[in-house]
C-alpha cells in the first residue's frame, strides 16, 4: 500500500449537493430556495424575524435583572495555588492574600475579592486570607495543615 492508494471507506464521504446546475440535476433553477421572496435573494435573512409571526423574543415574558451592586469575586482553584507554590511564584510560608496572588500572576485583577474553590489538590501548608471559599476548599486547606481567614462571612 502506498500513500497515493489510500482511500476513504465506502460511505464515509458524501458528495456535496451542486446547486443551480440546470433543471435536469434536480436542484437547478431556484436551487432549493423556493420561489421569490426575501429568503430566495442573496444575503442573510434578518435575525429574529419570523415572517410576520410574533417572534419568540416577544412571545416570552421578560425575566430577571442585572444587580449592579452584586459582588464580583475572582475565582481561584486550589490546583492553581499549588502550581504557583511549586513554581516558586508564591511563598507558602507567608500569608497569601489577593495582592500576593496578583503579584504571582495567579489572577489578573482583584475586583471585589478572591474566592477559593476546591478544584485540584493542595499539598502545601498555606495560610490564606481571602474574601470567600467553598466548604470543600476550606476542608482541603485545613487537611493540608494550612489555615484560612475569610474577610467576608457572606462569601462562604
From Swiss-Prot:
Key word Ribosomal protein present: yes
Any one GO MF annotation of this record: rRNA binding
This protein's UniProt keywords: Ribonucleoprotein, Ribosomal protein, RNA-binding, rRNA-binding
SUPFAM superfamilies in UniProt: Ribosomal proteins L15p and L18e (SSF52080)
Pfam families membership: Ribosomal_L27A
Region span, Disordered: 1-39
UniProt biased composition (Basic and acidic residues): 1-13
UniProt cross-references to InterPro entries, sorted A to Z: Ribosomal_uL15, Ribosomal_uL15/eL18, Ribosomal_uL15/eL18_sf, Ribosomal_uL15_bac-type, Ribosomal_uL15_CS
UniProt-listed GO biological process terms: translation
Cellular component annotations (GO), alphabetically ordered: cytosolic large ribosomal subunit
Record has Ribonucleoprotein as a keyword: yes
Compositional bias annotation for Gly residues: 21-35
The family this protein is said to belong to: Belongs to the universal ribosomal protein uL15 family.
Assembly mode: Part of the 50S ribosomal subunit.
Function recorded in the entry: Binds to the 23S rRNA.
Identification of the protein by name: Large ribosomal subunit protein uL15
Protein encoded by which gene: rplO
